Amino acid sequence: MSELYTSYIETFLTGLVDYARAEAVIDETCEQEPTYVTISQHLDADGSPLIVALAASVDAFYSLASGYSGVSLDGMDELAVDAVGELFNVINGHFSSRMRAEGRAVSIIDPPRHHHGAAEPDTCEFTCTVTSPIGSMTLIGAREEFVTAHTH
């Protein structure tokens, strides 16, 4: 795995703790729970597209939304999608800033988009299972957008 992707994964895990109060680790031995929502965002990394996505189980999705917003959003799907999308945007902004400090050009190109259910790219640059007491998630990196859904 490239240094850029490793840095992204580290930034993502730190962002979960910092912004959503959710401890998480990479655990490839853990089986992913069924995906409730997939959220993606288009970044540009050193002149190449990088689509990063988070596929979350229902428990993880609502826990992230509630952890980020500071209020329970259980069952409030649209508000929860907005909260997790904003969380993802904040984490990706932090990643962009971190990479720029290291001399790399990483920019956010488009706002997050979401799809209810699983979405997978034809070709992955990286994929890893993230486990947490709040539920399981899959973190995905690709070169082409694969979430055909609504922006928010």
Named regions from a protein language model:
Residues 1-152:
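N-terminal auxiliary interaction/assembly segments of multi-subunit proteins
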